[in-house]
Amino acid sequence: MRPDPVPAARRQRARIVVVLLRVSLGLLVMVMALAIHPSAYAADTAVDVKLTTSEITGTGANAVLHLAGTVTNTGTATLYTVQVLTWRDTTSITSRAQLASALAASPTATTGARLTTPGAFQVITGSPKPWEPGATSPFTVTSKLSDLGLTATGVYMVGVHVRAAIDMSASYNTVGRARTFVTVGTPSAQAATSTVVMLSSTPSYLGSGLLSDDHLAGELQGRLLALVRSARRLGVTYAIDPLLYREVSMMAAGYDVGTTAAHTPGTGGAAAIEWLNEFANLSGGYRLPYGSPDLAVMAATGDSSTLDLTTQAAAQVTDLADLPLLVAAPNYGTDDRFLAAVAQLKPAVVLAETKASGQSLTSSAGTVVSVDPAAFAGGPGPDDTDTPLQHLARFRAESFLAAMNPAEGNVRIVATESDAALDATANLWEARVPISQLRVAASPWSAAVAAHAATGVRDSSLERVITEGAARIVDFTSLAGDSAAGDVIRSEFLPSVLSTTWRSDDDARAYLTTALAPYGVNAAAVQLSVAEHVVMTSRNTQFPVTVKNTLDYPVKVKVMITTSNENRLSVPESDLVTIDAGESVTVNVSPRATANGSVDAVVHLVTQAGNEVGTPQAFVIDATETGKVAWVIVIASGVVLAAMTVLRIRQVARAPRRKEGA
């Protein structure tokens, strides 16, 4: 018997090694699979979910939640066994603070659970059938509220999860999500609900009868028309920008669009008349600061002068002069600095988000009305939050929670057509009241109840633009000799630079450039003409200076001449002269010389305020009349002496004759 060439112990060790190698290979395959799969599942939004229906039908134990929409494979991987399952979080939301926490929570948080009862899920495609990238499918899932565990009165977050595999295995992952809010039950009390409709638009006013563009022609038939009609409803208050009213009134009377140099007739006259008729039916309103400027930026920079200009401009719109003033920061925040700044305007109402929701509070700047600026915000995501369904769901949730906490009340700000449409939705738990009937908080406003500080949307660098614009207007009014006109121009245009309605700061800068174009002053605007060499031939010598006004408005200037030797020759400045647009005027000036000789001179133009305009002109004055005057004196003296001598001779010659005759 031949001996075994490989001992049994060694064979045993070899078998162990083979087993270990096989196990290691299996583990390696598993690791590779795990390494590959997460990359395909890494993006939970590989499948886009859009909810189109979210409603509860029925009551009590038979109430059913209906969710419907579409799912789209937006990834690059083919998916298998795609399913849409109902998801919900059974935590009842009963306050706005809890709602804010729910909105801030990650959509991938491990809260809530899926429901797999019949009807609560839908299979989009079975295992053998692939769901290719770009494919879209509809879905509808229904569940009883009792099965979902949504029974207590409150607001709940519900939605769907999309589950799928990247192969034909049973390894499923969540590849898409959508969430929204639903209300369950009915609050035991009604919420005092107020709405403030904001009537404002981007500035376009360039002066009497002229707008920079015709965007209002469309808005008066769309957004602004919807808003003014919304303001007629019970418990709704309006606040209008006097600049908007001025522009619409001007449109109704006939207007042009463009610039002072090039313009065409506007197209919104009929729409303006209709809108003004609608506005005339409103009552119980407020006015906004002229031009809807960013009050938070003014407060931060201490710009009290522009605040004053808003008051001056509003006074020019006499139809609205009796309306009380309503103010707010762009983010509806407030703080001590903001209130101190706007107190200068003496507002009746300050809209602000506070911890005393829906109530009014006394303050040094007027009554602070606490608002809910998020009333028309969107859904929780990760799906599209800016859809009609999500806006309605959020609107109902905010309103429902206000009713569950009736001491808070509910004040909403309406500024768009969609806001107006949502605000018109009837909610049984709301009691409509004007803001004047809101509950007064037990304590006055303080920093402790502020939700956040006031912040602006305009950049503070625009303050420099306003300063430069103001300087330009000063130059213009100095040249035109009309300080009152300067006050009007400043108030009409400067506050609008900080309007919160601009899409960008660059748009604000461009507007002011266009608005102030007619009031420009440059070196060539007023021209001087004088002879290069002027000779004084007598004490009463005058010489002309011609002044030409190339501007399209009258100017008032003085002619001023400086010389290289004021002691030898000086020229008094002229009286103030008015030169009409495009006209020329000759001004005669009278130099005063005390000695002969040539003197270098420069002629200037100055305004009544002493500001220099035009381009100075150099010339020479040659004074020769002083020598001639001396010779005239000598000759005259000689003539007088000769005359006296002749007279004396005659007197002497006659004297003897008189004696003889005696």
Predicted regions and their residues:
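Ala/Thr-enriched low-complexity intrinsically disordered regions
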Residues: 8-9
